[in-house]
Amino acid sequence: AGVLSLTGCSSKDTAASTASSAPLNKLDSIQKSGKLVVALEGAWQPWSYHDASDTLVGYDVEVSRAIAEKLGVEPEYVESDWDSLFAGLDAGRYDMVCNGVEVTEERAKTYAFTTPYGYIHTALAVRKDNEDIHSFEDLKGKTTANSLASTYMELAESYGATVQGIDTLEETIQLLTAGRIDATLNADVSFYDYLNVHPDADFKIVAQTEEASHVAIPLRKGDASATLLEAINNAIDELRADGTLKELSEKYFGQDISSEN
């Protein structure tokens, strides 16, 4: 399948009123409005970010656009920081979050997750001259920087690190290379992409989780979302079967993250 073009609209910290109510059938409401309101950060390359022409691009952007096409609607993108994404979903300000969200037992208690569309490992990065940190166990008593309420923050804290809240990977790398934090955690593919763009960046990856995390789309739980969940799952299955997910993965990550290896 060919890579889909990017022509949808984008708004900053705002959402369409069509996503603000809680209809009896969310899928019917979306298809009647002709819009699928999608929330993402827009500042996490290569998941969602602005290119040199300030166009919103990325794996999550194109995956959600392909899903919207399967549903017969247009995507409307809402950009927000990580900490606000779930609050906005809870409030019904948008229909779904497509932002490299890892499925966890705790999140699954609150949200209905779709079929995974990505599989990633969490990696640990330090400055190139750091000889103290070689594993996650070495984080005890160290300082890291990550988005608050992220799985990366939770993992760092579980190993005894103090976590400084930060919004973007770019800011995190700046803190790390300046020596203001000891380490940081993120998706392995995000670090590799950063190093591909900035080959002279002063950091190295020293460890990563053995088990892959499942990346999926969270929806609000409830009967109103049941048909929407089924429709998105069907769309993801079709996009995997026809090779679209693989193609988009290789475009943005240089490898296929759409299937569990």
Language-model features: locations:
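C-terminal motif of bacterial Sec signal peptides marking the signal peptidase cleavage site
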Residues: 4-8
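Extended ligand-binding regions for polar small-molecule ligands
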Residues: 10-12, 16, 61-70, 150, ...
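Extracytoplasmic small-molecule ligand-binding "clamshell" domains
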Residues: 18-100
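Short helix-initiation/N-cap motifs at beta->coil->alpha
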Residues: 25, 77-87, 131, 148-150, ...
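Short loop->beta-strand "edge-of-pocket" segments that line small-molecule binding or catalytic clefts
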Residues: 34-40, 136-149
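Periplasmic-binding protein-like
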Residues: 119-126, 188, 192-234, 255-261
